[in-house]
Regions:
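Mid-to-C-terminal functional-domain signal that highlights helix-capping/loop sites
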Residues: 1-223
Length: 223
């Protein structure tokens, strides 16, 4: 039993219940895969692409929207591939001998994952432990790209793609968040939203060099 208040790097008041309980959004822990010839997904569908040691795999948003986390092995490396539908962030990292699940909590409207070895909580966009025994520990990130299935399979024609045979009864052709993908609504509060001049869901890219000041009005607040 770990006291969250004693092992937290975040304000616990900002750790919110997302609705479903712990594991209420089930991770995929024994993923099955299709090929370009057998997948039901279309060329224009968005995927997360990962390639390690010559093995390429794609994880469709259609499936990730419902599960958010896939515990897999790619190129002989135990990996976890994650996606947060609320903030459109993708993060892949080495998982070692553990697996990760969906905690049911959100921080800054983003996925909070838990390590099944010791229940430590990790903020997905930063791949960092925020509560528990692994607080302040960072996960080893792996390259992952957001692209279309067409673009990915053109570059990696032998790539496998995550199957809809997940063991769960889900309609993987349906987006589960209604109009959220296209409207301006942010369901859960985030810091400094009143500073934004862009669309609330604008995708912002930035480069932050060590010892350089953070560009004014581009990024602010603690991590």
């Amino acid at each position: 039993n770990v006291d969250p208040a004693a092992t937290s790097r975040i304000d616990l008041a900002q750790l919110l219940n997302g609705g479903p309980p712990k594991d209420g959004i089930p991770s995929i822990d024994a993923p099955e895969f299709d090929t370009a010839a057998t997948t039901p997904f279309q060329k224009e569908d968005i995927v997360i692409g990962v390639v390690l040691n010559g093995e390429a795999k794609a994880y469709p948003y259609n499936v990730m929207n419902w599960h958010e986390i896939v515990n897999d092995t790619v190129g002989g490396v135990n990996v976890t591939v994650t996606y947060c539908p609320l903030c459109d962030t993708i993060v892949a990292f080495e998982r070692g001998n553990t697996t990760f699940g969906v905690s049911g909590k959100l921080y800054q409207s983003c996925l909070v994952m838990f390590d099944r070895n010791d229940d430590s909580l990790y903020a997905q966009p930063w791949a960092m432990g925020v509560i528990g025994l692994q607080v302040n520990q960072t996960l080893t990130r792996l390259p992952a790209v957001k692209t279309t299935w067409a673009a990915w399979v053109a570059q990696y024609p032998d790539s496998q793609i995550l199957s809809t045979r997940t063991g769960y009864d889900r309609d993987y052709q349906r987006y589960p968040y209604g109009p959220y993908e296209t409207n301006e609504q942010i369901i859960f509060p985030v810091r400094h939203q009143d500073q934004l001049t862009q669309h609330p869901k604008a995708i912002v890219s930035y480069v932050w060099q060590a010892d350089d000041a953070t560009p004014f009005n581009q990024f602010s607040g603690d991590s």
